Each structure stands twice: as structure tokens, then as C-alpha cells.
Amino acid sequence: MSTTAAPEVELVETETPMGELALRVAVRGCRSVAAHQYHRGALRILRPHYLDDSGQVCYVVVNPGGAYLGADLYVIDVEVGDGAKLLLTTQSATKIYRTPGSFAEQRVCLRLGEGAQLELAPDQLIAYREASYRQNTRITVRPSSSLVMAEVVTPGWSPDGASFRYEELRLRNEIQVETPGGTGLLALDNLLIRPPLNDVTGMGFMEGYSHLGSLVVVDARVEQALADEFHALTAGHDACTGVSLTASVGGTTGLVLRSLSNSTEELNRLLGACTALLRERWYGQSPLNLRKY
């Protein structure tokens, strides 16, 4: 296993990341293993483990510092090789504290090979009072790749009890499909919340809710029938949910689910129900149970 090369995410000459992490997963025998890994600064990964006999490897990302602060830059680069299977999660919530002077930022690059499976299941992102955070995720898939990415965003505690005391949250996902004929844009998902500039609590935005859940699925098996199933599946939860599909590019399609609630636990249950359906139907795996707490 190589441990020398840094991440491939682009940096300008003056930028020094607070933490860097690179991971490449490949198939060895009947299991997926790390063919290369690298870390520097305030990012680590724990030893791999396997939750079932599917061969999917699970890695846990750790930030020993415990939080993101002003002007912090974190860089994560992950490649899942042809036929490999990776579950990537975090040890705990990502906490964004006050960021005076400049925003905290995380840049993520994900690349999936043919037949590769990537499941992203991080703990919630918590933005505290006077926090500004930007997350830019660039994803490249192949037509036979399978991507499932879940995320929950919550406001942190504030002395006055108000929910939206952070300055800015900007979460951008760009998904490209690479085919023999070239690369095409499948989806550009840009979430921007600026509480000081807009009333984000009302109609057309957070609709009176405080927590946001997102699920992004990219797979050749995505179709309208799946979106309809998700609509029915989420109806029994205490949340306001919408599901949409992208156009097909290179034979694969994307699904985006957005859900609003006042509870992290409720959103985790909702997203967990959706991912459990996919895990059983597509991969023959049981519902995800990471048993962190």
C-alpha cells in the first residue's frame, strides 16, 4: 500500500491545508482494500473494517482537532477503482465554530471507476453562531458506477436559543459522467443559506424548519418508479420532503432528495430508510448500522 502521494485536489501556491486526506480503494481477491492512502495535518482515517460479507470496505474519517475554524482548509481526495466498494463515514459530527476573518472550507474530489460503489454516510454538519463554511465536492462517475451520498445540516446551539445564527453555508456538488465519448455534466447542486441576508425561516426556503437532509443517488437503475417509492417511503416521517430526477447522461441518472425537519434523528431515520431500500435491492446488504454511540 502506497502512503506517499498527496491528494490531487487543486491548490493555489499560497494555500496550506489544515488537513489533507487521500484514499484509493481497489479490489483484492473478494474484498475491497486500500491501494493507496495519505494523510497530513488534522485529518486521519481509522483502520478499515468490514460490516458484512459483501466485500465493501468501511473507512472512518477523523478530525483530531474536533472542529473547523476560520480560514481552515481541508482537502479530501477519494478514488474507488473498477469494481471496488467503499463506505466512507466520519467518527463524529463536523462542527463549524465562529470564523472571524474568513470562512472555513472543505474541498472534496471523488472518482468512481466502472462498477464501483461508493456510499457516503457522514455524521451531521453543525454550524454554530457566526460560522461561515463552504464545501465544494467534485464527483466523476462512470456509467456503471453507483453513488449514494447522504448529508444532514443542523444549526448549532446559540445563547439566545435562535436556530439560524451562522453567517453562511455553501454546499456545492458537481457530478460529471465520464464515457468513452467524453465527459458530461449530470448535476450541479448548489445549496446556499445566508441567514443575515435573507429570512430563511419562511415560505420558499426552510418553511419553518431548522434542519436539512439531502440524499444524492447516481446509478443506471435510477428511474421515476424509484422516486415515487421514496415519496411514499418518506410520507410517514415528520418532515417535508421533495424528490427530483436529473436527465440521463451516458446511460446513468441522478436522484436528489431534500428533506426539512426540526430533528436530526428524524432526518437520519428518513435517509436511513431510503438507503436501506437501496442497499437491500441493489447490493443485497442489510440496513446500515454503524453503532457509533
From Swiss-Prot:
Stored InterPro entries: UreD (IPR002669)
Location of this chain's protein in the cell: Cytoplasm
UniProtKB keywords: Chaperone, Cytoplasm, Nickel insertion
Gene Ontology molecular function terms on file: nickel cation binding
Assigned GO CC terms: cytoplasm
Quaternary structure (record): UreD, UreF and UreG form a complex that acts as a GTP-hydrolysis-dependent molecular chaperone, activating the urease apoprotein by helping to assemble the nickel containing metallocenter of UreC. The UreE protein probably delivers the nickel.
Family membership: Belongs to the UreD family.
Entry function: Required for maturation of urease via the functional incorporation of the urease nickel metallocenter.
Official protein name in the record: Urease accessory protein UreD
